[in-house]
């Protein structure tokens, strides 16, 4: 039976073919696209969606929501997946899906469709977001539909289908990799990058200068934070999206933010990804340093122990879970005093912190001084401190000969 379906639409070949395929079955298709900071000709995208069979096209500008509500919270967590990936795509998907669900309710669509493949993480992220926010919605995933992928096995068949149905196709060859962009990053995968030993081509990178060709002088930058969230760059207060865009510009021209890694996908396989995250790399380095000045050691250790878990939750698509809400509450409390300014230098792919200040610093220069501290710290008290903390070690040493005898 024909249905009213909202399709997560990127303007690319796959979602354009899916749009026509669903429309050919008599369905009423509303294409939804989200502006998360990617470089896109939105008028051309709307025109292509209509040419692909859509009855209506909805474009939502969610840049501020994305940065303020998803990217900055991840920076406050210091969330890196497997210690390296800044989660650019992982953070964007729940933001996009949330906005899509809002549009679906306005348009009275009870079904949503997406173009994510059955091998990737995005299918999980989109559908888990819908499960949390709109459990009543049904999903259509053509790349998991045998009728679809038996007819459209790959790019060659998709191009032929598009030409047959009058869908504009920019090129038939394309670059030897695929990419996904938002205001936080660009990710590259597939094609030549499926060989984990293959060096990325120099002309692949779009946001960052080649560190070898970056300026020969360090560029000084300051970042201000309020309760762990970036608030100003070089003394200028800006909205979250504008601040991240400016951080991208500064860090990118200095070659900062490239990562090439093999990661563990949620669906079980290993995957090679190359990422450019210039502004995010700069902001997280500054944030991490300011925590050293303002954050209690034990609170930091507790939060740090949860970073892999938080990053995994984001990567796997559980942003809107109760577990994530509980962890966000912990992060909120941990960031209560992370307010201040960090001074940095950007130079040929490197971010170097050169100083930091805070009105709520835990650092006491008199206590830490190696010179005359005017009685601020009584060094004689260290004797008892060390003796008490050494008690377990002395007990272990005393037991050692007995344990050795028992092992014989």
Segments predicted by a language model, with ranges:
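Nucleotide-activated chemistry modules centered on ATP-dependent adenylation/adenylyltransferase
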Residues: 2-8, 13-408
